[in-house]
Amino acid sequence: MEEEFPTISLLGIDFNLSNILMITVTCVIVLLIAIICTRNLQRRPTGKQNFIEWVMDFVRGIINSNMDWKTGGRFHVLGITILMFVFVANMLGLPLQIAVNDEVWWRSPTADPIVTLTLAIMVLGLTHYYGIKMRGFKHYFVGTYLSPMKFLFPLKLVEEFANTLTLGLRLYGNIFAGEVLLTIIATQLAHINIFVGVLAIIPAIIWQAFSLFIGAIQAYIFTMLTMVYMSHKVSDEH
């Protein structure tokens, strides 16, 4: 199933307008959630404040499972941002896809490998940055690439490439597969009679719920692996 997307060319480079739109929408939604949930904070949290505090505690638990809080506390906001961004991005294409003139405008941005691999590269780039910043270049390089044995250096380089590739493609594969199946189900529903269609709605709803679960799990996995890779770079014991 080949899809077409609106593009714009700038300086000889083609940009996917659908990705730009959906990433912007994702950022706006995450920003609104943060603003709404942190407005009028109370000593006894209720409702939306309970939700944002649960998210904060959840990410704190992820960090604490990989490194001590003294080291990992500075990545708390990063973890919250990644978790919420990836989750919202995963959800956008679940209820509907919008196409205009056979060009898809509305779908999950994480259903595009360019988006997920870019996220992975940014995350791995941050791990290297903080590793050098917190440990110094020499200590970081020796501890990361020459420990425990120097001859493992080529394998360590392969590992860096593999980590980046799998972090991005895992997220892409799960979200893309979910959207493809939902599209197939919706297409089949449009070509059958109303009585069979009513019955066919049931598996569609079940798959929607399953895709919601998968989207949440993938957001958790992406955040968890971010902190795992970060701990490998900034913690001496790794």
From Swiss-Prot:
Keyword Ion transport set for record: yes
NCBIfam families: ATP_synt_6_or_A, PRK05815.1-4
Transmembrane segments: 17-37, 75-95, 112-132, 172-192, 194-214
GO MF, one annotated term: proton-transporting ATP synthase activity, rotational mechanism
GO biological process, one term: proton motive force-driven plasma membrane ATP synthesis
CDD domains associated with the record: ATP-synt_Fo_a_6 (cd00310)
Lineage: Bacteria, Bacillati, Bacillota, Bacilli, Bacillales
Location, primary (coarse class): membrane
Functional note: Key component of the proton channel; it plays a direct role in the translocation of protons across the membrane.
PANTHER family assigned: ATP SYNTHASE SUBUNIT A, CHLOROPLASTIC (PTHR42823:SF3)
GO cellular component, one term: plasma membrane
Record bears the keyword GTP-binding: no
Superkingdom to which the source organism belongs: Bacteria
Membrane topology, as annotated: Multi-pass membrane protein
Name of the protein: ATP synthase subunit a
Protein family: Belongs to the ATPase A chain family.
Subunit note: F-type ATPases have 2 components, CF(1) - the catalytic core - and CF(0) - the membrane proton channel. CF(1) has five subunits: alpha(3), beta(3), gamma(1), delta(1), epsilon(1). CF(0) has three main subunits: a(1), b(2) and c(9-12). The alpha and beta chains form an alternating ring which encloses part of the gamma chain. CF(1) is attached to CF(0) by a central stalk formed by the gamma and epsilon chains, while a peripheral stalk is formed by the delta and b chains.
Compartment(s) where it occurs, according to its Swiss-Prot or TrEMBL record: Cell membrane
The entry's keywords: ATP synthesis, Cell membrane, CF(0), Hydrogen ion transport, Ion transport, Membrane, Transmembrane, Transmembrane helix, Transport
